[in-house]
Amino acid sequence: SIFEDSSRRLWVSAFYEGLDLYDRESDSFIHYKRDVSNPNAIGHNRVFTMFEDSKKNIWIGTEGGGLIHMEKGKNGPVFTSYRYNPDDPSSLSSNLINAIYEDSRNNLWIGTWAGLNRFDYQTKTFKAFRKEDGLADNVVYGIIEDKEGNFWVSTNQGISKFDPVNIKVENYNTADGLQAQEFIRGSFLKSKSGEFFFGGVNGFNSFFPQEILSNPNVPPVYITNFWIYNDLMKPGLPNSPLHSNITETEKIVLPYTQNEFSFEFAALNYSQAFKNRYC
């Protein structure tokens, strides 16, 4: 990748060979590579993406070396690495970085192969959001923010609309018109007109986020079947506590001898019912 910072310095990722800074005046390169004897050297040679935040901090996403912060030093750039630590839940969730983004609230977000991470500038720690938090998948390829402050995140299993304040997620897949479930890292763009583009394995999708409407109504949930000791209960059956259909029953009273029971429930939403989530 090639990246130009706010000082018009041109950085070139050699991918396997570290990072190069192009000197426009001398038409030459300054090379930065991993050096185990130098704690201030770049921590990994496989650089995939770079990003400059509003504070002029430059962040480097690597393939296997985590997230790297680059700042000015007396004798050149000083590199600080942030890596995944399985013993520290506040560490970066993966050392494989796909995307780096600063939102409208000046929070730094990192898309990785194991979730979407929010970086805390004060504590130097990370908070990860994953599939269990509602994302379509843990592999996050791209991050774009809309005018409402929501993130549209491309993943390995569709696109997620993520509200970072209230932690609410809406997921979209091929049933909604996506080119495929899987998208491609580095292939996302917000145009000057506000149109979003996400590239995938079977083409690309483009849309204006304000035109993607969701249904805010929460469907009612009903108990549809009821079992006692693996026997399906119906009105009129011996030992059945039901006096009417289970969907019309407001209360069930059981003796202590009928203490092993189970039930089945469903939401009355038949439009893409597979998207129903129960919390």
Task: Enumerate the language-model features and the residues they cover.
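Conserved beta-propeller blade signature
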Residues: R9-V12, N57-G61, N107-I110, N150-V153, ...
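Sequence-structural signature of mature extracellular/luminal beta-sheet repeat domains
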Residues: E4-V12, E17, I58, G65-I68, ...
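Pyridoxal 5′-phosphate
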Residues: F29
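Loop/turn residues immediately N-terminal
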Residues: F15-L19, E63-L67, A114-N117, Q157-S160, ...
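Residue-level detector of Asp-centered blade-edge/turn motifs that repeat once per structural unit
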Residues: E4-R8, F51-K55, E102-N106, E145-E148, ...
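Residue-level "micro-hotspots" composed of small/polar
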Residues: R34-R46, N75-P77, Y84-Y101, F119, ...
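Beta-propeller domains
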Residues: S54-K55, G61-E71, N95-Q122, E148
